[in-house]
Amino acid sequence: MYAENDTIVAIATPPGKGGVGVVRVSGPKARAIAHEVLGYDPKPRHAHYSPFFNEEGDTLDSGIALLFIAPNSFTGEDVVEFQGHGGPVVLDILVKRIVSLGARLARPGEFSERAFMNDKLDLVQAEAIADLIEATSEQAAHSAMRSLQGQFSKEIENLIESLIQLRIYVEAAIDFPEEEIDFLSDGKVLNDLDTLLSQTQSVFASAKQGALMREGMTVVIAGRPNAGKSSLLNALAGRESAIVTEIEGTTRDVLREHIHIDGMPLHIVDTAGLRDSDDVVEKIGIERAWKEIDQADRILFLVDATQTNEVSPERIWPEFYARIEHHDHITVVRNKIDLSEEAQGIDLSLSHPVIRLSAKAGNGIDVLREHLKACVGFESHAEGGFMARRRHLEALTVAEKHIQLAKQQLLSANAGELVAEDLRVAQNALSEITGAFTSDDLLGRIFSSFCIGK
């Protein structure tokens, strides 16, 4: 275990060579370390160009030093940043010098963790820092910045405040039992519960869009050999990612592509043709293909339109259909319509969606892209969204469930104690999102996924 009031140091810029490298120090010894490295006490919040000295007074490097005094810093502690040349060796030398002066190497995410512990930002904002760094599209970067600025946190805090006010009202009825029936049957509690449900569902819908922006969806292209799976992968990716030949079994392993559809990450997996094979390498690829299919958000069941007019996967390939656990994840894709002379488009009236396209000619690819967005409810034109994570959705789901339970308790039993308890559980679930009510284990998992120096 580390002391909570010790001083930490880390390189804050990415590994490798660059024009500038930043070493960040935070903790009670930051000012003393700055004095030893610079040879003088820097003025807070001013940029000082200076040599960086070792213990013998020799120059290690030169650059800019910035000192921030607690609580007016990112971490809420004394912080000093040394901005020198971006070579890994010279940065390591500077870090060793700072460690010799009483600092220790920071854990991944420890600077952000200290900012959270010192109330400089909440847990959603801390996560947004990592999401901003990892953003893979402009839309994702904008959404992460809105979360960092507190937009998502404000939505959650408003829900929590409404829950608190309703709990106060209900618990007042419990404290004055002779008034309880009047309190709980006057319509206010029911109306407030309905309002809370509506607000929670609205925040969940926005958070779901943010989670899709961050995590995207995984789509597996599956089917018999030579149905055109690799051609479809290339068409969706917009480049030649997979080898396409007329020879069955060309794809022997799982191929992956990562693209964006209007800002939503799409993880495309092209599987080996599913068939019985004596080839050892191909058999391994087929087993991997089944694992990917089991984990997919959507399965594109590719059919060669020149071989059959059937659209039911259960009839086309009964063995494949029987092995699939989530039949509602299947979309039938009739490929090669340029040869079968079918019209491109989508049919949603059947047991499974059916899309007719030509991967080789590119006809119907836009229809497929729009269908994939619709499958997960992604709204590409939604404005002002914020970034969210799976754990946020889970917490909102728990909160909504217990608000629903509170409503049921009110209507069925008029039981104030049970209503108040469900409201308390809902409040705690929402408080986990911002970190106001969070286990140390969860904090450890979140911050350990951050970069060192953040």
Swiss-Prot record:
Give the note describing cofactor binding and stoichiometry: Binds 1 potassium ion per subunit.
Biological process terms in GO annotation: tRNA methylation; tRNA wobble uridine modification
As cofactor, the record names: K(+)
Q: Where does K(+) bind?
A: 226, 245, 247, 250
Give residue ranges for domain TrmE-type G. Answer: 216-377
Q: What functional role does this protein have?
A: Exhibits a very high intrinsic GTPase hydrolysis rate. Involved in the addition of a carboxymethylaminomethyl (cmnm) group at the wobble position (U34) of certain tRNAs, forming tRNA-cmnm(5)s(2)U34.
Q: Which family does it belong to?
A: Belongs to the TRAFAC class TrmE-Era-EngA-EngB-Septin-like GTPase superfamily. TrmE GTPase family.
Q: What is this protein called?
A: tRNA modification GTPase MnmE
Q: What CDD domains has UniProt attached to this entry?
A: trmE, TrmE_N
Q: Please tell me where (6S)-5-formyl-5,6,7,8-tetrahydrofolate binds in this chain.
A: 24, 81, 120, 454
EC numbers: 3.6.-.-
- Molecular function GO terms recorded: GTP binding; GTPase activity; metal ion binding
Where does the chain bind GTP?
226-231, 245-251, 270-273
Keywords on this record?
Answer: Cytoplasm, GTP-binding, Hydrolase, Magnesium, Metal-binding, Nucleotide-binding, Potassium, tRNA processing
Top EC class, one word:
hydrolase
Concerning InterPro entries, the annotation shows: G_TrmE, GTP-bd, GTP-bd_TrmE_N, GTPase_MnmE, MnmE_dom2, MnmE_helical, P-loop_NTPase, Small_GTP-bd
User: What is the protein's quaternary organization?
Assistant: Homodimer. Heterotetramer of two MnmE and two MnmG subunits.
